[in-house]
Amino acid sequence: MTQNIHQHRILILDFGSQYTQLVARRVRELGVYCELWAWDVTEAQIRGFNPNGIILSGGPESTTEFGSPRAPEYVFNAGVPVLGVCYGMQTMAMQLGGHVEGSNEREFGYAQVEVKTNSALVRDIQDALSATGAPLLDVWMSHGDKVTAIPEGFETVASTDTCPFAIMANEEKRFYGVQFHPEVTHTRQGQRMLERFVLDICQCEALWTPAKIIDDAVNRIREQVGNDSVILGLSGGVDSSVTAMLLHRAIGDRLTCVFVDNGLLRLNEADQVLEMFGDNFGLNIVHVAAEDRFLNELAGEDEPEAKRKIIGRVFVEVFDEEANKQAEVKWLAQGTIYPDVIESAASATGKAHVIKSHHNVGGLPKEMKLGLVEPLKELFKDEVRKIGLELGLPYNMLYRHPFPGPGLGVRVLGEVKKEYCDLLRRADAIFIEELHKADLYNKVSQAFTVFLPVRSVGVMGDGRKYDWVVALRAVETIDFMTAHWAHLPYDFLGRVSNRIINEVDGISRVVYDVSGKPPATIEWE
């Protein structure tokens, strides 16, 4: 009998903090399953989930404002430990009889809290000692309001000069509140505090590990599809690749992968995908050479969103045609991951600002009569990569820089032509190769080349030429929500520019993009 890896579980209620998904990832890193739900869930839903503990996230609202979010009352009557983080601590304090006030002294950034009372949450945890020998913790604050009176039954565990209740605890009921963010790396002992809460106080077992996740996924796939066949669109990206490997392990040759070469891929990418998954791993792959079809559909179109829609529509058409040829196929597999599910749920309930719709959720043709298999839908991206390694996929493929779904279709500015794609592919390959050679590839978060639809005069030998311009883009970021342009060495940039202009006939000038996000986006289109 396979162990139930979902048996021990934490429920995280989301009050809108930008860090909430990070809380969930940190809990998962401890080896414990958790789910992220909107703050206004019902008692019946919480009972149905049956968590070992509940975490109340931070949030941008003020608890002192009328109508601001509150935790369901059942949270405090469920008989399980509760940890309130920042806003979560404030709503806990107010709902249990304490007091919160707005403060003129907004605390944002690094702070040092002094531990006053021993607590299960911070037992044996410290960063330094005060002059009087009290333990000190380096933490990351981000709040305006603060708790000014704690509820009955609570005690002050830690404080700062401006925040009298930085940590509060009711040890008997196992309720804890922290006015800082333990999930961010700036709180140096934050992960140890979460470990104290999840493993010690909630008494969860670390059952959520890559090997066990794979076993669980394989069993669930077999249970879901039985003896049926499955079809998957394989792009060579992380999510579809790991999905393919899981399905292949579960059902072997009953998986058919459709690889659509749309002519918008990186240099030699189609050959690499076919060699890795077909030759090395023995998957059934249908290779559809559809470059002409995509480029014909894109001809004359220069508006970025219209190009995205054309590429998406043609992909669905091509994939649908191939699926219809596979008469025995009953299931469609997709590489949907947990953040896609969270984003779609938030979009449906109107509880989050959605920047753009995700291609994996809701992008299927309505007439497709296949069941849906989504083996990664409980996993964050970092977890997908870890199980990819466990399944034997190469590190450099799993940790490659992100590549947009529409591919070079949004890296060739304006109208997309084969000539432009071919030039861009070669220029981009040189940039990436040089980043690897200089040991800079893993020091930047994303790097790529953009084709600009402008010509520039150049001099080659005794002659002048009038050729195309490309831009190099490299950024450093933690979450891709904001990014800094990467300060690559001048001699490195000079070397890349030299190689591109000399080796790629048709390019006369190379520029470097020094725009941050905001105001610019990472991709140009």
UniProtKB/Swiss-Prot annotation:
Q: Which UniProt keywords apply?
A: ATP-binding, Glutamine amidotransferase, GMP biosynthesis, Ligase, Nucleotide-binding, Purine biosynthesis
Assembly behavior = Homodimer.
InterPro entries the UniProt entry points to? Class_I_gatase-like (IPR029062), GATASE (IPR017926), GMP_synth_C (IPR001674), GMP_synth_GATase (IPR004739), GMP_synthase (IPR022955), GMPS_ATP_PPase_dom (IPR025777), NAD/GMP_synthase (IPR022310), Rossmann-like_a/b/a_fold (IPR014729)
Which pathway does the UniProt entry assign to this protein?
A: Purine metabolism; GMP biosynthesis; GMP from XMP (L-Gln route): step 1/1
PANTHER family per record:
GMP SYNTHASE [GLUTAMINE-HYDROLYZING], GMP SYNTHASE-RELATED
Protein's job: Catalyzes the synthesis of GMP from XMP.
**Catalyses which reaction(s):** XMP + L-glutamine + ATP + H2O = GMP + L-glutamate + AMP + diphosphate + 2 H(+)
Output this protein's name. GMP synthase [glutamine-hydrolyzing]
Q: Which CDD domains match?
A: GATase1_GMP_Synthase, GMP_synthase_C
* MF annotations from Gene Ontology: ATP binding; GMP synthase activity
Q: Where does ATP bind?
A: 235-241
Which residues does UniProt mark as catalytic?
86, 181, 183
Under Enzyme Commission nomenclature, its number is 6.3.5.2
Top enzyme class, one word, equals: ligase
GO CC terms for this protein?
cytosol
Question: Which positions fall inside the Glutamine amidotransferase type-1 domain?
Answer: 9-207
Tell me one Pfam family matched here.
Answer: NAD_synthase
Domain (GMPS ATP-PPase) ranges: 208-400
